Amino acid sequence: MAEPYLIEKLQSVEQTFQDLTRRLADPEIATDPREFQRVARMRSSMEELVTTYEEWKQRDAELKGAREILRESSGDPELREMAALEVNELEALLVSLEERLKILLLPRDPNDDKNIMLEIRAGTGGDEASLWAGDLLRMYSRYAESQGWRVKLLSESTGELGGYKEAILEIQGESVYSKLKFEAGVHRVQRVPATEAGGRVHTSTATVAIMPEVDEVEVSIDPKDIELTTARSGGAGGQNVNKVETAVDLFHKPTGIRIFCTEERSQLQNRERAMQILRAKLYEMKLQEQQEAVSSMRRSQVGTGSRSEKIRTYNYKDNRATDHRLGLNFSLNPVLEGEIEEVIQACISKDQTEQLAQMAQDQEAAKV
């Protein structure tokens, strides 16, 4: 039998779902398209939970019936065996449905459906760190392609021997943030650099930041805080390259954030793109503050998404990628080729398990 607090929550969601269904059937709402869309989205977000709860109620009723038959079938061994088998199957199914219901009841991250900007910065390790940042960019590009997402390079600062000192990708598609948010943090590589004549293993790092895309309404920027200069672009631009100042160098005075955009074809487009990146960076800073406040109350083992948190080590000698949050090893080569879905799903599962444990703990505390 599901815990009483779970039943109460499910009944409350079911009631809200029914209220929203009636609201959508009201002819008056058709006169306000924006309100209609808002209500329809809310109802849609609850549909899987309500459908699963309906199935749970149906199976729970079937279990009660099967147990009743089991009690009354002492004189019929064949019927008793069938009833016992059905009871076992239904009990297992109800446990599975209850776990699913708990996961569906977890609060949803409002950013999960958003597109992202993925920033990779070379850390310790000099030229080798830049090469490693380039390898990570390739890994994420490959993974994004496997998911059917669209990838575009927005900004780059190349390393002297290749790779990137810094690069920003725009990744668009279904539920991008919900998966890649677990990739934020420090990625450490242990390998013999191509520049190392002695064959010694070096350790280098690169930091990954995952920034959900935001609009102007979500982040307000005072124009007085922006210092903007232009330069000749060395990027796309055809006949305009090095003749017209299409590149934009944007500096945000309060935070010290500097963004250099050259990838678009006009100065206006590069300015808009730089502002878009700035909004995402400022929003991510706000998210970091919120997550640090939450993590002080609930220390997540999956990770806080902090830029300073070492999340994974890629060891070339042992052909092993170790995720430190999970305490699990993965084969290195497939991971570097972008086959990281297994890692990400393991992070999602662990995060859900932690949230469920916190939910149960909160319920116990409420009883005291």
From Swiss-Prot:
Belongs to the prokaryotic/mitochondrial release factor family. Peptide chain release factor 1 directs the termination of translation in response to the peptide chain termination codons UAG and UAA. GO terms for cellular component: cytoplasm. It is found in: Cytoplasm. The gene is prfA. Its main location: cytoplasm. It comes from the Bacteria. GO terms for molecular function: translation release factor activity, codon specific. Gene3D superfamilies: 3.30.160.20, 3.30.70.1660, 6.10.140.1950. It comes from Synechococcus elongatus (strain ATCC 33912 / PCC 7942 / FACHB-805). Pfam families: PCRF (PF03462), RF-1 (PF00472). This is Peptide chain release factor 1. The keyword Protein biosynthesis applies. The keyword Nucleus does not apply. Keywords: Cytoplasm, Methylation, Protein biosynthesis. InterPro entries: PCRF, Pep_chain_release_fac_I, Pep_chain_release_fac_I_sf, Prokaryotic/Mito_RF, RF-1.
